[in-house]
Swiss-Prot record:
Domain of life: Bacteria
Family, similarity comment: Belongs to the ATPase alpha/beta chains family.
Quaternary structure note: F-type ATPases have 2 components, CF(1) - the catalytic core - and CF(0) - the membrane proton channel. CF(1) has five subunits: alpha(3), beta(3), gamma(1), delta(1), epsilon(1). CF(0) has three main subunits: a(1), b(2) and c(9-12). The alpha and beta chains form an alternating ring which encloses part of the gamma chain. CF(1) is attached to CF(0) by a central stalk formed by the gamma and epsilon chains, while a peripheral stalk is formed by the delta and b chains.
SMART domains: AAA
PROSITE patterns to which the protein is assigned, alphabetical: ATPASE_ALPHA_BETA
InterPro entries for this protein: AAA+_ATPase (IPR003593), ATP-synt_VA_C (IPR055190), ATP_synth_F1_bsu (IPR005722), ATPase_a/bsu_AS (IPR020003), ATPase_alpha/beta_chains (IPR050053), ATPase_F1/V1/A1_a/bsu_N (IPR004100), ATPase_F1/V1/A1_a/bsu_N_sf (IPR036121), ATPase_F1/V1/A1_a/bsu_nucl-bd (IPR000194)
Bilayer topology: Peripheral membrane protein
Organism lineage: Bacteria, Pseudomonadati, Pseudomonadota, Alphaproteobacteria, Hyphomicrobiales
CDD domains with a match to the protein in the record: ATP-synt_F1_beta_C, ATP-synt_F1_beta_N, F1-ATPase_beta_CD
Protein name, as recorded: ATP synthase subunit beta
Reactions catalysed: ATP + H2O + 4 H(+)(in) = ADP + phosphate + 5 H(+)(out)
Keywords: ATP synthesis, ATP-binding, Cell inner membrane, Cell membrane, CF(1), Hydrogen ion transport, Ion transport, Membrane, Nucleotide-binding, Translocase, Transport
GO CC term (a single one): plasma membrane
UniProt subcellular location: Cell inner membrane
Length: 476
């Protein structure tokens, strides 16, 4: 329940991003937004704790440099409200819904609180339909569900953001509905690139409005932890509004780990005792509150694709481990694969999807995926023998399996549209039927005569055959 608005209080203490405020009358409710002036800026503080002696402890959504004790603070009577509706499309907003793209105010249909209840069980709906991404390794081995939650796991610099940008390129551009991108604690440069990329490719119009399809909500690396801990909720609120109007929404988050990290930064300042690896004791609760809202209802769907940073490449770290439970499909990026120059560096044996069932994808797709994994697993188990004794000591059967596995490994790579400017190679979108046909043929030994190099960075199997002919002609 909202507390009476316009109650005023005074700042009694400022410790980094945490500010204590004393009120004389009615205390603002937990999660209420209270406001003060910091120079020319409107500074929003969110109530986190009631301390007693009429004092509340709050988390600042912007820098607290310049605040002084005794400064006046007003209670807004509501949680943080952000603009929602088609007026947000093509615009960049910050955590409190203010535009940061210098294109004037956001024309909002409505203002909506960033803290909402998750939909009831009775309102939720599930579909068993595949979202085709055009990326071979994903579509074959860990297919994404429409209206599902997808996690892209990977350490630093293995290609999570490039993969999410390629998914935006392949899925959001072909998708008729609206998309929302929440940039949580990532590089400002990447956010800027994405904004301009959307305008150049026609997904958005400069200045937003008619013809734009994607709303951007950013709280980047340089923002205080309060903003990074809440910006995912602000983006989700925009997406929920579109869903409740009957839209099928795509919701991209880069990066969910930064949401957890920001929570752990403020947790100690709020006086909570840290839990495992120094994370906040409320880690599972915070993650659940966010993830349970990202769901498909009887009105519309949210398909969410989330990049999840893996600290020190350790998937058992509490932050990535907590997010695993909420996902329908996981795409795990592996540094060892990226070191071989195979991009996207998706681990074919470590990526999973509940959609990979013969009842959903069909018998042929399922069998092909399992054959590919079987060949790769066999190669993996033979690697120790190869390292010690060499290829010559393998049986003829094993030699064939290894040769096919190495071809499959290379065929799992493909050039991306968003990487064209770096590589000079045109991007490729591969249909699911072509993907299945290509891998099935390699497993069946139809292309045993082609060299490994023919399968590297191509789209369909026909391109690999062409490349093989070209390589043979050059060698002759």
């Amino acid at each position: 329940m909202a507390s009476p608005a316009n109650q005023t209080g005074r700042i009694t203490q400022v410790i980094g991003a945490v500010v204590d405020v004393q009120f004389e009358g009615h205390l603002p409710a937990i999660l209420n937004a209270i406001e003060t002036k910091n120079g020319d800026n409107r500074l929003v503080l969110e109530v986190a704790q009631h301390l007693g002696e009429s004092t509340v402890r709050t988390i600042a959504m912007d820098t607290t440099e310049g605040l002084v004790r005794g400064q006046e603070v007003k209670d807004t009577g509501n949680p943080i409200l952000v603009p929602v509706g088609v007026g947000t499309l093509g615009r960049i907003m910050n955590v409190i819904g203010e535009p940061v793209d210098e294109q004037g105010p956001v024309k909002a249909e409505d203002m909506r609180a960033i803290h909402q209840e998750a939909p009831l069980y009775t309102d939720q709906s599930t579909e068993a339909e595949i979202l085709v991404t055009g990326i071979k390794v994903v579509d074959l081995l860990a297919p994404y569900a429409k209206g599902g939650k997808i996690g892209l796991f990977g350490g630093a610099g293995v290609g999570k953001t490039v993969l999410i940008q390629e998914l935006i390129n392949n899925v959001a551009k072909a998708h008729g509905g609206y998309s929302v991108f929440a940039g949580v604690g990532e590089r400002t440069r990447e956010g800027n690139d994405l904004y301009h990329e959307f305008i150049e490719s026609g997904v958005n119009k400069k200045g937003g409005g008619e013809g734009s399809k994607c709303a951007l909500v950013y709280g980047q690396m340089n923002e205080p932890p309060g903003a990074r801990a809440r910006v995912a909720l602000s983006g989700l609120t925009v997406a929920e509004h579109f869903r409740d109007q009957g839209q099928d929404v795509l919701f991209f988050v880069d990066n969910i780990f930064r949401f957890t990290q920001a929570g752990s930064e403020v947790s100690a300042l709020l006086g909570r005792i840290p839990s495992a690896v120094g994370y906040q004791p409320t880690l599972a609760t915070d993650m659940g509150a966010l993830q349970e809202r990202i769901t498909t209802t009887t009105k519309g769907s949210i398909t969410s694709i989330q990049a999840i940073y893996v600290p020190a490449d350790d998937l058992t770290d509490p932050a990535p481990a907590t997010s695993f439970a909420h996902l329908d499909a996981t795409t795990t990026l592996n540094r060892a694969i990226s070191e071989k120059g195979i991009y996207p560096a998706v681990d074919p044996l470590d990526s999973t999807s509940r959609m990979l069932s013969p009842l959903i994808v069909g018998e042929e797709h399922y069998q092909t995926a399992r054959m590919v994994q079987q060949v790769l697993q066999r190669y993996k188990s033979l690697q120790d023998i190869i390292a010690i004794l060499g290829m010559d000591e393998l049986s003829e059967e094993d030699k064939i399996a290894v040769a096919r596995a190495r071809k499959i490994e290379r065929f799992l790579s493909q050039p991306f549209f968003v990487a064209e400017i770096f590589t000079g190679a045109p991007g490729k979108f591969v249909d699911l039927a072509d993907t299945i046909k290509g891998f099935r043929a390699i497993c069946d030994g139809k292309y045993d005569h082609l060299p490994e190099a023919a399968f590297y960075m191509v789209g369909t199997i026909e391109e690999a055959v062409e490349k093989g002919k070209k390589l043979a002609a050059e060698a002759a």
